[in-house]
Structure formats: C-alpha cells, structure tokens
C-alpha cells in the first residue's frame, strides 16, 4: 500500500509539472535581468520587484513546512522554472536559468522524502479498525441476552434448552465415552423402533446410506472377482454370495460377512487356477480407493508383497506343471479384501450407534427439561432453589453469570443418560424418580458460592434493585435528617466524624461535642526551611496553647490566671533543661516542661489547683489511651523481683583518741620528796584511754604527744637564762646523759602494732622518751608502762644550762619526727 501511494503522488506531481510547462507565461521574462542590471524599463521594474521578491523566498520555505501544504505550493515554485526554459534571449537570463536549474532537483527530492513518510498515516486507522469490531460485539451479546430473557416469558420452557445444547461445542466429546459402552449394549437398534414415530427421518436416512454403501462394496467385489476368475468358476460364486450377504444390513452390528468369506475361500481354492500377482495387487489397490480410507500400503495390509522373488518362482513352476501353485497368494488377497470389508462395516456401525445415541439424548432432553421445571416448582415451594434452575424459570430476570454456570452443570447428567438408557430401555415413567436426584448435585455447587443470592432472587423483580439503589441513600438520609442542625454549621469536609460519635453517644452530648472543637486551622505552606525554622523559634507553643485554651473554655472551666514569674528563675534553669543557648526563648515562649515550680507555699497551692483543673479537663477530653499487647504477662521472677542496693563501703565507728584537761600541780613545800611529786604529776597529767580504737593505729597518738613535747621545749627556750659556770661534775653528767641518749633504749609495748618492715627501718634510730631524775644524777632512765614520759623542771634547767647539748637533742628529735612522718 505504501508503494502504491508513493507512485500515485509522484505521477500527480509529474502531470502538474507538464501542464505548467505547456502554459507559457511571457510577462515573467523581463524581471530576471532587472536583478543584475537595475537600469531598465520602469513599468517592467514594477512587475520585476514583485516577482523578484517571490523567487528567492517561496521555493525555500515550503521545503521545511509540513507535507500537506506542499502540493498547493509546488506549482508556485515551478512556474518560474517554465519561464526559465522558454527564456533564452539574454546571457543574464541564461545565467539565472542555469542557477535555478541547479535548484530544481533539490525541490522534488525533499517532498519525495516527505511523501515517503506520508504512508505511515494509513496503517494507524487500520489498527483502530481492527479494534473497532470489539465494540459492537458487546451490545450484540446484550441483545442476545435480552432475546433470551423475552423468549421464556412468551414461549414454553422446552424449546429454549435444545438451542443452548445445539450451540455447545462439547457434543463431540460425548460419543468417546459411549465407545467404551458399545460392546455391553448389543440390542440398541431394537429400541430405536420403539421411538421411531417421534423422529422417523434420522434413523431411516442413516440405515439406507449404510445399505447402499454395503451394496456398492459387494458389487465392486463381484466385478473384481469376475475380472480375475474364469466365468465357469465365477457363476456358482455369485449364487452363493447373494444368499448370505442380503441379510447383513438387518443384523445389528454382528460380523456375519466373516463366515461368508470363509465359504468363498474354501470354494475358490478348489475351483480357481493360478493368476498373476500383479493383476491382483493392482485390483486390490483400486478397490481400496473406493472405500475412502486411503490407499492400501504394505504396512497397512497383510499381503505378502515382500516375497516377490519366491512367488515368481512359484508362478513359473505352476505354469509348467499346470497346477495351482499360487493359491496361497490368492488366498492372502481375498483375506485382505474381507478384512477391509469388516473394518468398514465396524466403522459404519459405530457411526450409526453414535447417531442413535445423539438422537436419544435429544429426545430425552425435553423430557428432562419438563421434569426439571416440575422439580423447580417444588423447590420454589420449599425454598431450595439453585442459581441454574432460577435462570430457567420464565418469570424471573436472568443474571449474566447464570448462563455461564448452566453449561458445565448440564454436561454431567447428559453423559450419564446413555448408560442409564441402556439399562432402563427409555421408559418415561420409571425415569422420573431417577432425575430428581440430580438437582442436589447442582445445589452443592451453587451453595458453595452464595446462599444470600439465592434467597434474594426468589423475590420479585423490584426486590433485586432495591438493595442497590434506594437503601444506600436511606441510611445517609436518616443520619442527615436527625442531625441537620449540627451538620449545617460545620464545614462540608468534616460532617462524617460527628455522625460516628453521635451514633455511640446521646443526642444531647452531640451538641456539646460539635461546639467544643471547631475545625483546626490549616497550616500555611512554607516557602523555605528558613521560614520553618523561624516559625518554630517565634511561635513554638502558640498553636498548642490556643487549642488547649479553646478546649477548656468550651467545657465551661475557667482556670485562674497564672502569676507572673521572675526572669531570674528562668535564667537559673537554662543550664539543665537541654536548651542550647541562653536567651534563645523569651520568658513567655519557654516550653511548659521547662518552667520551674515556685518555692513559696502560696505558689504551691495555686499550682495544685491548676493541676487539678487540667487533670479534669484531660479526663473529660476524648483522648485514646495507648494500650500494650494483650495477653502477655511478665514472668513472676521479673515482675516480683526485689532489688537490694548494697554499697561497696563499710561504715565502722570507734573512738580514736581522748583528751583530759588537768591543772598543773605546784611544788610541795611540806618536805615531800621530789621523786614522789614527779610520780604523782605523771599519774595526774596522763591518763590511759579505757576504750581502745578499733581501726585507727597508735601512731597518730604518738605524733600528737611528740608535738606537744616539742612545743613545751620551744616555750622554754624563749626564756633567756644566765649562763652559769660549769663545774667538772656537771660536764661529766652531761656526757653520761648524751651517752645514754645515744644508746637505743626502747620503751616496752610502744611499737607492738607496727609491721616487721617498719620495725626493721626503725632499728637504726628509734624514737626515745627520756625521764631524768632530780635527786641522783647517776640513776638510770626510768621506763614507764604508760608510754608517756614527763621531764621535771630541775632536769630541764640542767639540760638547758648548756646550749650545745640542747641543740643536739632538738635536732635529733626533729629528725626522728620527720622520719616518722615519711613512714606514715
């Protein structure tokens, strides 16, 4: 099609070009030289300007424009071409014509490309036309349904069902099941004689054709035998063939011709002579073609065609001897003919049986339909109708889905009919109780689909349409009629929610709910993220607070106004409320959870009242609680677990040290010995602590006591005394004291609690406490059990007499104290 369209367009263009060339346009000759030579005739120039403007512009533009407008513009482009060919008077004209002649082939090539694109248009409507016939098929199907709906109303129910069966393509599958039943039922042709007056034409036509076919076969066989066999031998065979073959059509499927063939073979073997195999083979092939089952081949037949060499030798021996040596090959050919006859007879009998079965089915169909209608009427009274039976009733509107269900359901009983008819011999009265057992099978299929549809279809026609159209507006109209006042005040987008709440609550509470919650304002669409951030900064809680205030006002509760809060309290809380920068929120814009609670009692009372009011408002508000998973409980070991927090540190209490304050005892003048006074002073000043500390060691007490002793020495040093002249005895005494000090005299029970390592370190320079007696300078140093040593004043004065000795003692004491501090 595309090539034809292109050729047609090219031919049209060529014709137009030829017509334009024939028409000579003389006044267009002068304008072309005017382009190159401006001095020319004035009247001609006026025409040349108009034409010159058209020549360069017109031929170039239509090439780029669409194809539809090219045909109208092609003559305008080619009119100057005609003038160029005719004008050959001047050199300027020849130059201009040559230039334009180069431009001429460019113009037709472009439309040719565009014309090649044009045939793309026609196949598109062809595609649409291929889709168009899909549309009219659907209204035709609806018309066919309407015709079917109208027919059961006016006509009886019986003729409608055979039409549906005649349209079914499932009919050829039924005789396949009947073939397996054929050998079990040999007497079916006798039944047809009982039902012949109902449909007399169909069985007669089939039997007559079968008889004619058999007669033709017999005649052909006789002719074949007459050609092959001598006339003297053939005469008695005809008489024998006629008598047994005549009653063959009366036999209802029994293989009678096999016996006749055996008789023929026995007589022919006795009377006939040898005949060439080529004639028999050619005749059998010709006879087989008349049967209509295809040519007989070596694989198809049982002839001995593979043994030609042996058979040729047998023929030669037979000819020389004059005996019937080739009788075996002739017998084989006769057997093949008889087998083919038997096969054809079997096939014809099967076809007859199939036709008879179809006729019986068609005859039984109206009976089944009449019985089905009677059963349906009984079912309608009992209320056990099915969808398929309802579609067959005349006074009901059929549904589109029902005819689809009829086809597979009806196939099942039809397949069962030929088996039952073979056993019952097509008796009308006893068949009636057998058929009503089938509707429950149909009902079992339909009950699984829907029982509600079956109940709804039992009613009249308007009941089918009522639940679809009128009921839905009635449900909405009742709700809208009861609540017209509430729905009118609200916006059209929110009328559905109050209806649901009103259905659960009373009519009085519905009015309060509608007034309490007006529709929330729609948020504005922000143009950028910056605007959204600014809105969060400057208006963080206005929307939420305003909504809460509206709820409280609607419920009739007016909470007390809150007192002004100092800004200093907010500043004190900025650090701990997860606010990034101080001063980001103004005092009024801080979230509710960040506001501190007041410290005064009055403020606490006010807050309690406000909390009670807010709790009541929250309880009254319809807020849904979030619920966890139901039916899942924690185990008792987890739910009833008791956690006991135990600290790592143990607390122990005990007395570390004790202090006793006593007055100093003055020196007695009553003549008491100085030794007794010294013992008394030691007992009074120092007292043991009865309760020993449990944890602390005695080293602390020792350090404190040593510090006290050093302080006393320092106080004594402040007092300046006159140096007395030392005697030899005094110097000797001081040396003895220094020697004794150097000796490591340990006090018993002093370092018992120290560890071994500390004792080893202290062996070099242990701490010593010295008590100096006043009377006898040569007395040894007294060791006391109380671990505390007191030096008398007389001993101190003697020790202080020499500055050098005192300085040495002080240095030793300080060194020992420093070592003890380091050890501790």
From Swiss-Prot:
Residues 44-74, 279-291, 533-546 have a biased composition (Polar residues). It comes from the Eukaryota. Residues 624-635 have a biased composition (Basic residues). Residues 140-153, 205-226, 388-428, 553-566, 722-743, 790-799, 809-824 have a biased composition (Basic and acidic residues). Signal peptide: none annotated. Residues 75-89, 499-516 have a biased composition (Low complexity). Residues 343-359, 375-387, 703-721 have a biased composition (Acidic residues). Keywords: Cytoplasm, Cytoskeleton. The keyword Lipid metabolism does not apply. It is found in: Cytoplasm, Cytoskeleton, Actin patch. Residues 15-645, 694-824 are annotated as: Disordered. Belongs to the AIM21 family. Involved in mitochondrial migration along actin filaments. This is Altered inheritance of mitochondria protein 21. The lineage of its organism: Eukaryota, Fungi, Dikarya, Ascomycota, Saccharomycotina.
């Amino acid at each position: 099609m595309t090539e034809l369209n292109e050729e047609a367009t090219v031919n049209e263009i060529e014709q137009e070009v030829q017509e334009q060339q024939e028409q000579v346009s003389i006044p267009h000759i002068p304008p072309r030289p005017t382009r190159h030579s401006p001095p020319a005739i004035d009247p001609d120039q006026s025409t040349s300007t108009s034409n010159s403007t058209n020549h360069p512009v017109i031929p170039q533009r239509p090439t780029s424009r669409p194809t539809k407008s090219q045909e109208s513009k092609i003559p305008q482009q080619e009119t100057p071409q005609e003038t160029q060919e005719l004008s050959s008077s001047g050199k300027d004209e020849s130059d201009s014509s040559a230039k334009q002649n180069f431009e001429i082939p460019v113009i037709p090539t472009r439309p040719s490309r565009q014309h090649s694109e044009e045939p793309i248009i026609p196949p598109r409507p062809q595609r649409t036309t291929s889709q168009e016939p899909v549309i009219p098929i659907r209204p035709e199907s609806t018309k066919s349904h309407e015709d079917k709906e109208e027919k059961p109303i006016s006509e009886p129910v019986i003729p409608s069902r055979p039409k549906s069966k005649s349209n079914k393509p499932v009919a050829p599958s039924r005789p396949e099941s009947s073939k397996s039943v054929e050998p079990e039922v040999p007497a079916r042709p006798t039944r047809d004689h009982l039902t012949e007056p109902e449909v007399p034409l169909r069985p007669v036509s089939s039997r007559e054709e079968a008889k004619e076919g058999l007669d033709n076969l017999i005649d052909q066989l006789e002719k074949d035998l007459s050609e092959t066999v001598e006339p003297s031998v053939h005469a008695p065979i005809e008489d024998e063939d006629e008598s047994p073959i005549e009653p063959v059509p009366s036999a209802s499927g029994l293989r009678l011709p096999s016996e006749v063939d055996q008789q023929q073979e026995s007589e022919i073997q006795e009377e006939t002579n040898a005949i060439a195999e080529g004639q028999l083979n050619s005749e059998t092939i010709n006879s087989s073609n008349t049967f209509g089952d295809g040519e007989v081949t070596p694989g198809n037949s049982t002839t001995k065609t593979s043994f030609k060499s042996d058979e040729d030798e047998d023929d030669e021996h037979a000819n020389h001897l004059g005996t019937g040596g080739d009788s075996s090959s002739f017998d084989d050919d006769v057997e093949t003919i008889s087998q083919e006859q038997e096969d054809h007879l079997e096939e014809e009998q099967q076809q007859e049986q199939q036709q008879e079965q179809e006729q019986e089915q068609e005859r039984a169909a109206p009976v089944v339909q009449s019985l089905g209608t009677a059963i349906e009427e009984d079912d309608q009274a009992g209320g056990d109708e099915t969808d398929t039976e309802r579609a067959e009733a005349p006074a009901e509107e059929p549904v589109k889905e029902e005819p689809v269900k009829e086809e597979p359901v009806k196939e099942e009983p039809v397949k069962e009919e030929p088996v039952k008819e073979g056993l019952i011999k097509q008796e009308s009265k006893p068949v009636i109780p057998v058929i009503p057992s089938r509707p429950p099978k149909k009902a079992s299929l339909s009950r699984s689909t829907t029982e509600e549809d079956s109940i709804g279809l039992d009613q009249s026609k308007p009941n089918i349409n009522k639940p679809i159209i009128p009921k839905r507006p009635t449900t909405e109209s009742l709700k809208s009629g009861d609540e017209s006042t509430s729905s009118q005040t609200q916006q059209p987008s929110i009328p559905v929610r109050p209806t649901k709440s009103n259905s659960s609550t009373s009519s009085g509470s519905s009015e309060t709910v509608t007034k309490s919650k007006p529709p929330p304002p729609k948020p504005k669409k922000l143009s950028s993220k910056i605007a959204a951030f600014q809105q969060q900064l400057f208006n963080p809680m206005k929307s939420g607070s305003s909504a809460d205030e509206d709820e409280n006002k609607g419920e009739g509760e007016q909470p007390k106004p809150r007192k002004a809060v100092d800004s200093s309290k907010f500043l004190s809380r900025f650090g701990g409320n997860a606010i990034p920068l101080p001063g980001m929120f103004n005092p009024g814009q801080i979230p509710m959870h960040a506001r501190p609670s007041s410290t005064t009692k009055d403020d606490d009372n006010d807050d309690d009242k406000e909390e009670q009011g807010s709790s009541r408002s929250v309880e009254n508000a319809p807020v849904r609680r979030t619920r966890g998973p139901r039916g899942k409980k924690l185990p008792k070991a987890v739910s009833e677990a008791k956690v006991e927090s135990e600290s790592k540190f143990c607390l122990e209490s005990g007395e570390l040290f004790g202090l006793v304050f006593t007055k100093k005892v003055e020196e007695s003048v009553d003549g008491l010995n100085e030794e007794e006074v010294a013992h008394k002073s030691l007992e009074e000043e120092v007292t043991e602590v009865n309760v020993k500390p449990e944890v602390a060691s005695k080293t602390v007490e020792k350090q404190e006591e040593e510090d006290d002793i050093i302080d006393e020495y320092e106080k004594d040093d402040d007092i300046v005394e006159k140096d007395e002249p030392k005697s030899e005895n005094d110097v000797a005494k001081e040396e003895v004291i220094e020697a004794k000090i150097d000796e490591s005299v340990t006090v018993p029970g002093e370092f018992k609690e120290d560890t071994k390592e500390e004792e080893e370190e202290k062996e070099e320079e242990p701490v010593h406490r010295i008590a100096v007696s006043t009377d006898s300078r040569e007395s040894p140093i007294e060791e006391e059990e109380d671990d505390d040593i007191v030096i008398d004043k007389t001993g101190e004065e003697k020790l202080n007499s020499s500055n050098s000795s005192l300085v040495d003692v002080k240095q030793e004491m300080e060194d020992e104290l420093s070592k003890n501090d380091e050890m501790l």
